[in-house]
Structure formats: structure tokens, C-alpha cells
UniProtKB/Swiss-Prot annotation:
The active site is at D123 (nucleophile), D250 (proton donor), H280 (proton acceptor). It comes from Psychrobacter cryohalolentis (strain ATCC BAA-1226 / DSM 17306 / VKM B-2378 / K5). This is Haloalkane dehalogenase. Coiled coil: none annotated. Catalyzes hydrolytic cleavage of carbon-halogen bonds in halogenated aliphatic compounds, leading to the formation of the corresponding primary alcohols, halide ions and protons.
Amino acid sequence: MKILRTPDSRFANLPDYNFDPHYLMVDDSEDSELRVHYLDEGPRDADPVLLLHGEPSWCYLYRKMIPILTAAGHRVIAPDLPGFGRSDKPASRTDYTYQRHVNWMQSVLDQLDLNNITLFCQDWGGLIGLRLVAENPDRFARVAAGNTMLPTGDHDLGEGFRKWQQFSQEIPQFHVGGTIKSGTVTKLSQAVIDAYNAPFPDESYKEGARQFPLLVPSTPDDPASENNRAAWIELSKWTKPFITLFSDSDPVTAGGDRIMQKIIPGTKGQAHTTIANGGHFLQEDQGEKVAKLLVQFIHDNPR
């Protein structure tokens, strides 16, 4: 497996991003290893809040949320998925599979020995994170889902997703910062857009971002469909606290919150919130609001 590593210089002087990098190695399934970057903020002896990003962002997306969570006394773990952020980037599209992404994040949980986790997941962070919850129920204490889903391919994903999937494959240059900009309702500065572009010096670094839309199960016989169906069976028995924090202006995942509230027992009685003035990347549009809701959710649902 050929692996690319973004130079550290690309991450210098990013706006509102003053966090120390941490790294661990995960098996790449081909007799070598990938370096995974993660943030580890707040007291090490506190129960962890795990923040999982999605396509095509990285943990920079959580820069507004982390200070609020740590100020409330929480430890925050925010990894970059392989192919994104400061994590290594396999150079071939075929290096990326749904199962490998799950395995890579499973390795992060295992190596850091995370328990009593509160998960916040958005976009692909949910496709991966909800699998982790279903497969490691004893590690997780609470779940907060925002603008995400866990598709099995048994239901149509909608016109919004199909348009995004087609766009991601046909555009000659995949402009990551522009994609983030188009998924927000607030105006992003050029410096913030550049920060989202920072992990990708050129198109060769973007194979993971290009491949992600094709890995979403969209047919019943998708390679990930069976495992996702199994995950839903487990989630249908999940009685620990589960809250939905979706935004009001995301055409891709709209309605996913109602599905979760219908199926997952742990959603009963929770203060589910539709966050106003938030696009798909609600952490960018309303990060402070999301973080405060997450702090309240943890407070209202002690172990």
C-alpha cells in the first residue's frame, strides 16, 4: 500500500486551532501500518467524549466545540480518519473500504482503551461510529448523532445524496474547502476554507475523499449492508441515552433523526433538538451551540 503523509508545515498557523497533535499506528491490512492523528484535550482521567468527523473534513471541524467540552471537565478525543486531516492517506482508491474505516477506528478505541465514551458523530462519523457502538456496546455510555445516518441499502438515499455522489466523482478538481463552504449556511473566511484544504497538497492526496461517497451502501447487496443491518438490530436494543442533534438546513440527512428516534429505545425522553441556522456541517455553523447541548446531555444523563 502506497501511503502519502501531508507535511506538517501545511498545518501551521491555522485560525482558532491551537491543539497538540497525537499519533498512533493502525494496521493497514497489508502488512504495514498507517499513522492516525488524533486530538486528546482535557483531563486524562475524565470520561472521554469521542468526536468523529466525516467527509471531507477533519478534526479542525471540532475546534469550536472542544474548548467548551474541556471547560466542562470532559476529556475530548478527536481522531482524523485515514485519508483526512493529519492522518496518513493511502494513495489508491481501492485502499479505502467501509470495513477498513471501521477497523481503523476500532484500533483507536482499543489502543487508547476508551470506556464510558460519549460519542458525537456527524456524516461518515455516524456511519463508522454507530457501527462501533453496535459492536462495542460496553465501551459507550451515551450517543449524540448529528446530521448522519446508518444506511443498509434497503431504502433510497434520496436525490440530494445522488447529486452529491455524482458531483464528487465528476468534478475534475475536488475542492475540499469549497465543499465545506457549500455545506454551511454561514460565510466562511478564506483562512478557514484554506484550513480545510490544508490536508490535501494536491489531488493525489484526495483519493479517500473521492472514494467515500461510493462506499455509502446504496443497494441491498452492498458489501457493508449486512453488517449495517446487524448494527441496526443492536441499536434497536440500545437503552442507554441517545440524542439527536440535527440541523435545520441539511438536505442530505434530513429526516434521519426521526428514524433514530423511532427505532432506538435510548432516544425516549431525551431533549432532541433541531438546531437552527445549521447546514450539513453544523459544527462549523453552530459549534458552540452543539457543544453546549452535548454538555447538557451528559449532565442530564449521568452514568
